[in-house]
Amino acid sequence: MPPQRAGAAGVAHVVLENGGAATWRSRGADGLQLSYHWLDRHRNAIVWDGPRTPFPRPVAPGETVAVDVRLVAPRPPGRYVLRFDLVEEHRFWLSEIGVQMLELEVDVEPGIAERRLAVVVHGAPDQRTAAALAAQEEPLVADAPAATAHLVAGAEPAADWSRLLLDAHAEGWDAVGPALVPAGGPFERRRAARRLAPWAPGGRNPRLDRPLLLPSLVAGLEPVTHDRLPAYAGDGLFEGRALVRLPMRSGRRRS
């Protein structure tokens, strides 16, 4: 089994022997399936229903079969117990009826190997943005980043923005979006506050029903555009504590 990184998908090669009296049969998505549970060290379930892997053929008593199992490592990093299990779909898990299953202690590593964040500023150079980036708690990099954050000219991230983004990536989130705070005069702020309400500061939300705006993305992911801002519409974390002041006087945000 390869090293596991929080939130990342991988493949484990598993060899099983049918030590029972009945043939193992998968019937598409039904029948007997191979799956797994992620447990903490006290055997409490962290992720109970892992993806199902059907057997490639019937496995008679006494036979062995090799199966490649798609694993998704849990969040956050730490030490977990990985228990492989067989499930008779819609009926029962074999471990629940006393069948002993293989358990492994697994150290799940951070989602990023190094805390290296780069920034792409979309638009012309801006002194406000440059000053805010220079004041970050965790310095930014130009080479070999683990993740790249996307801003627009005039945006001013808070000093802890880089740290909070890297914390979330280390937890296993490939995409992280900050909270947006409208800047400008009172009228612009009031109007923008209604439009930006879904991205207002607050807690963390892994199920935001809107695209992440001004996202930070691990290598391999690219932003799209939403409301003329860099965005990401896939799975990700809205980090409502990471604040970015967004200019409202620009034509970019006027309707």
How does the language model describe each region?
Residues 24-25, 91-101:
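Beta-sandwich strand segments
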Residues 35-55, 98:
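Short beta-strand and strand-turn-strand segments in soluble, beta-rich domains
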Residues 70-78:
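Short, surface-exposed loop/turn segments at beta-strand-coil junctions that are enriched for proline
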Residues 109-135:
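N-proximal low-complexity "stem/linker" segments adjacent to membrane-targeting elements
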Residues 143-158:
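Short beta-strand-to-loop acidic/aromatic patch adjacent to the donor-nucleotide binding site
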Residues 160-191:
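Conserved donor NDP-sugar-binding/catalytic core segment of glycosyltransferases
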Residues 179-184, 188-216:
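Short, flexible, basic/aromatic active-site loop/helix in glycosyltransferases
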Residues 232-254:
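Active-site donor/metal-binding and catalytic loop motifs
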